[in-house]
Regions:
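N-terminal, intrinsically disordered charge-dense segments
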Residues: 19-21
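Extreme N-terminal basic, low-complexity initiation segments
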Residues: 2-10
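Short hydrophobic targeting helices and cationic amphipathic motifs
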Residues: 13, 17, 29, 40-43, ...
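Beta-rich accessory regions
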Residues: 85, 319-562
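Short, Lys/Arg-enriched N-terminal segments with co-localized hydrophobic residues
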Residues: 43-65
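Beta-rich carbohydrate-recognition and catalytic domains
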Residues: 56, 62-168, 172-232, 237-282, ...
Length: 562
């Protein structure tokens, strides 16, 4: 193979000469995934010889057509041409791993949900987006709108990095309704000439037409007792005051904190109230995305501690998403009363972070998460898009622990459904669905005192599958193993996730599959396990295996696009 830079230059030049970028995207997928895209594939074969094909495949697999320098990541949006963005959108749309009933990026990278709210008769959520590639670059808020928390309308980019107080990114934040407008509060990321970060907590108004007008000056600047890591404001109203809680790193101790501020006038002076007192344990070196939500009238703090000692709460992901439930929250004192000894994992799967929750006008608590993690690469990075949001979950409390369940409107996605029941063992397998497809919901109850494996996304023999291992007898457990579910990734942090179950009890699972995403609700939402996996799309068998025939029953539905 010739020198990398020369090779890339020759191949890329030929691509530009011989086919459009959109055709190149389809050609790439044709060869990598085996699609029968006759026209572009034939076009490619006619115009390029096999050696050049191999070069392009290698370079695209390596992601070498774009070198993501700092300068490139923070290039102003107006420096990118419209054709590039359209090509990236086409590439994302054509991906075999693309989501069909979850919010996913129109192009590039998606991360934290922002501004989750109910305003002007509709639900709103924004997400952090870098539109030009699968990397963390110059971020905006991308706006989505829904009538039912399930079917989402794409409203486009909303909060863009276009002022001196958000020049290097409109970072995460929240929203609250004030009279006939939605008030947005977000972190403006600014880098100076020495690349030192400055964080500003900014405000903006969104009217009923969706027009956004930013405030001229920041609401809050970083106090002296925090480092440059000071972000992700959640704005709340309590009594006649406004409050904001933020993720922070204490300057002296370099530990993670939740800062709290108050104001009588939303756009006036904000008072530093110090840190929220909710634990006597060290929460690592940084806390991100703090959220205070009231669930069944009880305060619950949801947050992402980075660098948390695993002796405090065990976790396996690079960074966890956790919560602490309490009985009281004193706003002016910044104190939560709780008997919870340590934070609890919000999700027991592989890929949940930056969950944002809020209380709807009727008091119900809803949450939505980024399905992805910081500092983790996903296979779709090679297709220039990354990540998605979870489905919305309704929150409740049971014995001091959060219960998370799908919202009722998820049922509107259900298409033809049918009952499933115990089948005979044939060739060592009990086949639940021979061809389930890639968009479905499976509600299944597995009887007590059994052990075995539920295979999803399985090939004919289910030796390749997403494996859900269980024991419903003594020492009961439930485990997800994605090591044989197609393309492996992020193995550094393990390929299995396991939870303990009550002994000698039936196991109830509500499983949602959306091509490359699985959301598993265990025992009516007592646990949720969320994960990405990248199996061959032809593998869609559902089956059970065990030493003996397994007893089960349930319902299977195909699901529509949102």
């Amino acid at each position: 193979m010739i020198a990398h830079s020369q090779d890339m230059s020759i191949v890329y030049h030929k691509i530009n000469q011989l086919s459009s970028k959109a055709e190149t995207i389809l050609i790439y997928q044709s060869f990598i995934y085996g699609n029968r895209l006759t026209h572009p594939a034939n076009l490619f074969i006619i115009k390029m010889n096999l050696i050049e094909i191999n070069k392009i495949i290698i370079l695209m697999k390596e992601g070498s057509f774009m070198e993501w320098t700092t300068e490139k990541r923070y290039l102003p949006y107006n420096k990118w041409d419209a054709e590039t963005l359209l090509d990236l959108q086409a590439q994302a749309d054509q991906s075999q791993s693309q989501l069909h009933y979850h919010i996913r990026p129109s192009s590039g990278l998606l991360n934290d949900p922002n501004g989750f709210s109910y305003f002007n008769g509709a639900w709103h959520v924004f997400y952090q987006q870098y539109p030009f590639g699968p990397v963390h670059g110059l971020k905006s808020w991308h706006h989505m709108k829904s009538a039912d928390l399930v079917h989402w309308e794409d409203m486009g980019l909303a909060v863009k990095p276009d002022t001196q107080f958000d020049s290097h990114g409109a970072y995460s934040g929240s929203a609250t309704v004030i009279n006939d407008k939605l008030f947005l509060m977000y972190t403006g990321n600014v880098r100076d000439q020495d690349w030192v970060r400055h964080s500003y907590q900014n405000g903006a108004w969104m009217d009923q037409t969706g027009h956004i007008e930013k405030l001229a000056r920041p609401l809050i600047e970083a106090p002296d007792h925090v480092t440059e890591h000071f972000r992700d404001p959640q704005i709340l109203k309590h009594g006649d005051k406004y409050y904001a809680i933020l993720g922070a790193q204490d300057k002296e101790t370099k530990t993670g904190k939740i800062a709290i501020f108050s104001a009588s006038d939303l756009t006036g002076k904000w008072t530093d109230l110090g840190y929220v007192n909710f634990t006597d344990k060290d929460m690592g070196y940084m806390i991100e995305c703090p959220n205070l939500v009231f669930v069944d009238d009880q305060p619950v703090l949801i947050f992402c501690p980075q660098g948390l000692d695993k002796k405090i709460t065990p976790y396996e992901n690079i960074y966890p998403n956790m919560y602490v439930a309490g009985s009281k929250f004193k706003f002016d004192a910044g104190k939560m009363t709780t008997t919870q000894a340590a934070p609890i994992n919000l999700d027991d799967g592989f890929d949940v972070y930056a969950t944002q929750a809020f209380n709807a006008p009727d008091g119900k608590a809803y949450a939505i998460s980024w399905v992805g993690l910081p500092d983790v690469e996903y296979p779709t990075d090679n297709e220039n898009w990354a990540n998605c949001l979870s489905q919305v979950k309704e929150l409740s409390l049971k014995n001091g622990r959060l219960i998370q369940r799908p919202v009722a409107a998820m049922g509107t996605l259900r298409q033809a459904g049918h009952l499933i029941r115990t089948e005979k063992v044939i060739d060592g397998r009990q086949v639940v669905e021979s061809h389930a497809g890639q968009q479905y919901e499976l509600k299944i109850t597995i009887a007590r005192n059994q052990s075995g494996t539920l295979h999803l996304a399985g090939n004919h023999t289910v030796d390749q599958s997403l494996q859900l291992n269980f024991n419903t007898g003594k020492d009961a457990f439930f485990e997800i193993d994605r090591s044989k579910a197609g393309q492996t990734f992020n193995e550094k942090f393990g390929v299995t996730r396991k939870i303990r179950l009550p002994e000698n009890q039936d196991l109830d699972l509500d499983i949602f599959i959306d091509h490359s995403l699985a959301e598993v609700f265990v025992n009516n939402g007592e646990h949720v396990m969320t994960l990405r996996y990248f199996a061959d799309q032809k593998n869609d068998k559902i089956a059970l295996t065990g030493k003996n025939s397994l007893n089960y029953y349930g319902t299977f539905w195909n699901l529509a696009d949102m």
